[in-house]
């Protein structure tokens, strides 16, 4: 974090975090900020502080026009290591299991099935693909796995359960010509973190102001001033949960 240095913020990691200064805010973002203050919301200078709430600048991971992804922050520094092979455009089919131990993965690249084995296997395919791969490999709820003729290697009913998402709804307005903003400016600068009136969970809601939400339903790149502004409300701490099930083998 190049803006704040305290016990909640790192200072030496490969992913840059920063916030837009008030002088750099778009007019629509500034109007959203000032309206929230007028309606009684607190000012929030640091959304990454776990105790904060209110309206303020969003932490972003772009710097000097470059978004610092994990590919840039981590892989670009490590891709030339002798003990690292990066396989792009590859589809993992399943884990390779020997007894009760994962020994590798079976993946497809250029229509060829390839086995890759190692002493340690780390599965980090996200909240949906990780349980999906486990079930394809025979790890999970037998009632679901057996439907598709996959041998059950390890019965683990919790695989794919308690799936939580952050549903959102957007409301978009057409801006008057004098309120339109530079198309090359950042469309997301300000966020509101708050507790909904009927919730027992603190800060269960996030509302972001965005000038990049398309009114016509499609995203595109244009040199014309942005002519819309939207509020995107996220349910950030949901109570309900869902499941991931296999649909085929």
Where are these regions (language model features)?
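Conserved redox-cofactor binding core of oxidoreductases
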Residues: 1-102, 108, 170-174, 182-183
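FAD cofactor-binding and catalytic pocket of flavoenzymes
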Residues: 169-249
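Glycine-rich loop(s) and the adjacent beta-strand/alpha-helix scaffold that form part
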Residues: 94-95, 100-183, 246
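General small-molecule cofactor/ligand-binding pocket signal
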Residues: 44, 85-87, 151-155, 208
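Residues that flank catalytic or metal-binding motifs in active/ligand-binding sites
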Residues: 11-13, 88-91, 101-103, 148, ...
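Flexible glycine/proline-enriched surface loops and loop-helix/loop-strand junctions
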Residues: 12-18, 126-128, 176-177, 225-229
């Amino acid at each position: 974090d190049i803006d704040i240095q305290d016990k909640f913020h790192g200072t030496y990691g490969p992913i840059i975090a920063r916030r837009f200064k008030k002088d750099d805010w778009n007019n629509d973002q500034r109007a959203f900020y000032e309206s929230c203050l007028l309606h009684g919301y607190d000012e929030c200078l640091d959304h990454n502080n776990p105790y904060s709430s209110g309206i303020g600048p969003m932490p972003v991971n772009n710097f000097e026009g470059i978004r610092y992804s994990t590919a840039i922050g981590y892989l670009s520094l490590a891709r030339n290591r002798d003990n690292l092979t990066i396989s792009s455009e590859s589809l993992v089919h399943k884990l390779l299991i020997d007894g009760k131990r994962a020994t590798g993965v079976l993946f497809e690249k250029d229509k060829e099935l390839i086995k890759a084995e190692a002493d340690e296997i780390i599965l980090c395919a996200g909240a949906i693909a990780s349980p999906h791969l486990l079930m394809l490999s025979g790890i999970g709820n037998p009632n679901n796995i057996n439907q598709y003729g996959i041998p059950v290697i390890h019965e683990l009913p919790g695989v794919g359960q308690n799936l939580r998402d952050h549903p959102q709804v957007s409301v978009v307005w057409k801006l008057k010509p004098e309120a339109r903003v530079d198309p090359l400016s950042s469309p997301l600068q300000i966020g509101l973190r708050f507790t909904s009136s009927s919730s027992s969970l603190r800060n269960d809601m996030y509302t972001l102001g965005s000038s990049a939400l398309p009114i016509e339903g499609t995203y595109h790149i244009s040199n014309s001033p942005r002519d819309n502004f939207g509020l995107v409300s996220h349910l950030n701490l949901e109570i309900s949960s869902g499941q991931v099930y296999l649909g085929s083998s």
